């Protein structure tokens, strides 16, 4: 099992709200993925491929911003939708990690709910841990 496959399995084991994980290249090819079978929301694969290409281009723009040293290095990007949160993390110059998290509110509230909290510290710790291993 490659370190990228280990990463995907560790993320799925870590949090039951993670519905889908994938590692893709900058051309939109999905190289590895895991899907939670009991997920209520299914993200269409063609949409994920389009998103990978779009996010790859966005990371190029973010890298130009970080070259200015004012903000520092970009770590991850979160796009929030009513049903999911989409997290994108660059693994290296050629691979992106995509994590789709269930965004259904935890409980019905009288005030408007904007979904679930994504524990990026823990997700990034898993990414860093797996990246310490050699292929």
Report residues per predicted region.
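Non-catalytic interaction/Regulatory regions outside core domains
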Residues: 1-135
């Amino acid at each position: 099992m490659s370190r990228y496959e280990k990463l995907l399995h560790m993320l799925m084991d870590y949090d039951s709200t993670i519905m889908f994980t994938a590692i893709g290249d900058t051309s939109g090819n999905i190289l590895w993925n895991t899907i939670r079978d009991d997920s209520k929301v299914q993200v269409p694969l063609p949409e994920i491929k389009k998103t990978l290409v779009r996010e790859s281009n966005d990371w190029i723009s973010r890298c130009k911003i970080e070259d200015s040293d004012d903000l520092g290095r970009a770590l991850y990007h979160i796009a929030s939708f009513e049903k999911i949160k989409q997290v994108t993390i660059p693994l290296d110059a050629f691979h992106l990690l995509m994590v789709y998290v269930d965004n259904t509110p935890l409980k019905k509230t009288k005030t408007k709910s904007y979904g679930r909290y994504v524990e990026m510290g823990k997700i990034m710790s898993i990414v860093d841990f797996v990246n310490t291993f050699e292929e």
